Amino acid sequence: MAGACATFFYNLNAASTLIKSDEIDYAVIGSAEAPINPEVTDGFFATTGIADDKKIIAMQERHGESIEDIDFSKACRPFGDNCGLVLGESSQFAVVTSLEFAIKIGAEILCAVPHVFINSDGIKKSISSPGIGNYITMAQAFSNYIKDFDNKKQTCVIAHGTGTFQNRSTESDVLSKCATSLDIKNLKVTGLKGYLGHTMGPAGGDQLACSLGIFNQGIIPGLNSTPILADDVVKENLNFCMTNEEINIDDLDAFFLNAKGFGGNNATTSIYNPNFVKKLLPEIFTKKEINSYEKSLENTKKKKFDYNEKCLSGEFNLLYRANEELLNPDEDLEINQDSIKLKDYPDIEI
């Protein structure tokens, strides 16, 4: 599914919708894009939204920095006095399951994805101009968070943060207006494109991977390439993480991952702390089921550790299954008025 910079979240939403409707137990979702080539780069230059050597040097000069060489490590400066986006490349994939299926197979729960909100703009003044839809998705995410948590602690937005003039003013206004309207105080804000560039379709996957890493390690990566916020950045009720911040993981309730895509493809995804899910388990499952899950989880973590150790030593034993257990339509398939029967699979209702 293609939705410009919101593509990953569109795919995540498709999986979430199917899981919540009990049509599937799990899905592998993601996006991959490699846009750094002459044709794509020339196209972005035509939009005037991309940083080039001349713009970067001028930006460095405005900041009183050396202009003898380009500092590519700070070419993209989200929410700062910047000069345009920098193209990046990425491939991000995730396994999404229902809670019941995760417990059944002994999966390690890394987070909860309760909501993905999408609102595409129909009427726009230009193809790349932000519209009203992102206010809607962000307000929906904030509102549902308020309903879901009784004792609220900290929250953090991993912003779209492209490093363009338009983004810094419009996205900060979205965040501030929604936070202020819904009485969310001291909302932390960071972004990743100062590290990775703008990876286009997989950008939401970068944000998801980052949020999982923060829940695991307790460090929020700051806007380290941005020395100071631009004058037109809206700051009310927002706490921009200008440097890396170490946090207590238990004090962080949720992340809000935001995408403001070309063509008005807006999406905001709520990511809840895995501890939030673990506290709910006794309300949903029996003690016997939880004990069984915890034993299976130990085995999962051991396999994960062993696999990681092999990878670190250069052993990559990839799984590639070809011509294994293929179903024969003459022998393994039966179709009737009510269902489709497949050998060794549950019936499919029709």
Language-model regions: role of each:
Residues 23-83, 116-130, 159-168, 185-238:
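Acyl-CoA/ACP chain-elongation machinery
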Residues 55-150, 155-156, 272-334:
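Condensing-enzyme catalytic core mediating Claisen C-C bond formation in acyl metabolism
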Residues 1-33, 86-105, 198-223, 234-244, ...:
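Active-site-proximal alpha-helical scaffold in enzymes
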Residues 11, 137-149, 174, 178, ...:
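Stable alpha-helical structural segments in soluble proteins, enriched in small hydrophobic residues
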Residues 8, 15, 44, 95, ...:
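Conserved small-residue
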Residues 214-263, 267-268, 277, 282, ...:
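Internal helix-turn-beta structural module
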Residues 25-29, 92, 110, 156, ...:
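Short glycine-aspartate micro-motif
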Residues 16-21, 41-54, 133, 170-182, ...:
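A glycine- and small-aliphatic-rich helix-loop capping segment at beta-alpha/alpha-beta transitions
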